[in-house]
Amino acid sequence: MTRNSASRETIDVLIDNAKSTMSYSEQLLQNAELIKSKFSEHHITHYLQLLFELLSGSLSAIYEVCSDIKNMLSTENVYTKRFHMQMINLSQYELSVYLVGRDQGGVISELITYLNKSHQDSKELEDILQQVKLLGEQCDIRLRNVTAHYDNPNTMYTMLTTLNDEDVYVKRFGNQLLIHDKILKYISSVLQIITEKLSPDKKNCTYKKSVEE
């Protein structure tokens, strides 16, 4: 198992940050799902529906991968590490498919289409889309397929023995965090604009979020 030399202190910080991010993501995800559950009760634009699908999808993936990163770094058992690498690969690939879509039908792709039809700026989302595509391209699709379908365990176990560099998955998680941060900033700015339009007297209020890096 390959790992660049990192102090125990550095590893512990990564584990603690993963725990904090999981806690934060879980709380925000609950709020997002609650809002989505109200969509059927009120008239709401397709754009806002997609916006909250983007939020909940990214939060779910962050929670899943944080859990696997934490568990991967917390153990010295090589087989346990490989299992969590396998699950990180699966989660990140599924995130890419959900946001991009196999035929450009993912959540971000739909948001961009909506904005373009409305003659509104989609540059920020297009930048996020490209980064999500790169993340998906870094995933092992064959490993994802045998993991998701589990119809050929011998092939899966053989592939797992080739997973030896946990640094690859830590770095890829770093890329995912950057994408997630951009998604949060985009959604936050949109919601702030909506709030200001609904409550003109509150234009000067500021919104702060605390995310464990």
Give the residues covered by each predicted segment.
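Amphipathic alpha-helical interface segments
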Residues: 1-138, 163-213
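Histidine-centered, metal-coordinating catalytic motifs and their short helical/loop contexts
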Residues: 129-160
